[in-house]
């Protein structure tokens, strides 16, 4: 049996753009992608902390160091510039792999620079 587990998480990203006329996806600063082991075209789930919306799309890498977090196409309808979002990727693991899997988690500051890297997520973690 395979289990779907969180593989990477970008916590408290601030939306910098929402481009309704783009074909689709989310553009993410490629330096952030590297830190959480996310790849171009990888499926991600996005949770908007401001309005509760949850959407799925795929990644387009943005300019490294730019701090860009841009929701494109239909996904742009679910955010406004300045909204705080959580972006998560998932992987499929055997039960044995899942028991030892350690996801990569980064917390961003208000300018989308990596503020901290969390080695794990504990119950009742608040930032």
From Swiss-Prot:
Source organism superkingdom: Bacteria
One family name in Pfam for this protein: Asp_decarbox
Any one of the GO BP annotations: pantothenate biosynthetic process
Positions contributing to substrate binding: 57, 73-75
Active site: 25, 58
Regions annotated as coiled coil: none
Cofactor: how bound: Binds 1 pyruvoyl group covalently per subunit.
Locations listed in the record: Cytoplasm
Record-level GO cellular component terms: cytosol
SUPFAM superfamilies documented for this protein: ADC-like
Post-translational modification: Is synthesized initially as an inactive proenzyme, which is activated by self-cleavage at a specific serine bond to produce a beta-subunit with a hydroxyl group at its C-terminus and an alpha-subunit with a pyruvoyl group at its N-terminus.
Subunit structure as annotated in this protein's UniProt entry: Heterooctamer of four alpha and four beta subunits.
Protein name (record): Aspartate 1-decarboxylase
């Amino acid at each position: 049996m395979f289990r779907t587990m969180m593989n990477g998480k970008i916590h408290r990203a601030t939306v910098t753009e929402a481009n309704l006329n783009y074909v689709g996806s989310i553009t993410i600063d490629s330096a952030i992608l590297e830190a959480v082991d996310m790849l171009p075209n990888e499926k991600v789930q996005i949770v908007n902390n401001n309005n509760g919306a949850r959407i799925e799309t795929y990644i387009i890498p943005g300019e490294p160091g730019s701090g860009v977090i841009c929701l494109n196409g239909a996904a742009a309808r679910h955010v406004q510039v300045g909204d705080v979002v959580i972006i998560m990727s998932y992987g499929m693991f055997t039960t044995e792999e899942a028991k030892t899997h350690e996801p990569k988690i980064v917390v961003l500051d208000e300018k989308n620079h990596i503020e901290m890297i969390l080695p794990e997520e504990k119950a009742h973690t608040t930032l």
